[in-house]
Design a protein with these regions (language model features):
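FMN-binding flavodoxin-like domain, especially the glycine-rich phosphate-binding loop
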Residues: 1-89, 145-153, 158-173
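Amphipathic repeat-derived elements
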Residues: 22-39, 102-111, 115, 131
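A mid-sequence, solvent-exposed acidic-amphipathic segment
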Residues: 74-111
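Iron-sulfur cluster-binding cysteine motifs and their immediate structural context
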Residues: 96, 101, 105-122, 126, ...
């Protein structure tokens, strides 16, 4: 399963299927779901929504039927081999305004654990710009204003507003 912010999931499903197969798993199904983009709430707004949830229900029934019918093949998913290369790593960290109350919700919610629990303004290298800290801050004190991030937001808001639908893949279907 891949969750993405209404742009594209690139090779994520293929990479996941490959990793699981390398570990000896048969992967009968895969899906790419749309969620609100982490950098801007204007892209993928309100997703997943009721329409998505109906599609998820239908997909889960198809997967259950495939598994119960002793489906033993691995699903074919889109993607590229070799996988699309990663862009160069750029050390961009969120900033913290004076309105920070040191509640530490940002540190608690950071999946990379790069925000210090001693001082929310101290952020180690390793931020993936998921914006969990920005979204969890009750004071709006966490933010990104770096040119690189703002440029990406502008590109997303210009090119990725059209609704994309979840994509589902079931072996033998």
């Amino acid at each position: 399963m891949a969750v993405y912010g209404n742009r594209h999931y690139d090779d994520a499903l293929l990479e996941a299927v490959d990793i699981l197969q390398e570990q000896g798993f048969t992967v009968p199904a895969a899906a790419a779901f749309v969620a609100e983009h982490s950098l801007t709430p204007k892209v993928g707004t309100g997703r997943p929504d009721a329409r998505d949830m109906v599609a998820v229900g239908d997909f889960s029934q198809n997967v259950a039927a495939a598994v119960l019918s002793a489906c033993c093949s691995t699903v074919t998913v889109p993607g590229n081999r070799p996988y699309r290369g990663l862009p160069p790593v750029v050390d961009i960290r969120p900033k913290t305004s004076q309105s920070c109350t040191q509640c530490m919700l940002c540190a608690t919610n950071c999946p990379m654990q790069v925000i210090s629990f001693d001082d929310a303004a101290k952020i180690s290298q390793g931020c993936i710009r998921c914006c969990a800290c920005v979204r969890s801050c009750p004071e709006g004190a966490k933010y990104f204003d770096q040119e690189q991030v703002l440029n990406i937001v502008n590109i997303l808001e210009k090119n990725c507003l059209t609704r994309r639908e979840p994509e589902f893949f079931v072996a033998g279907a």
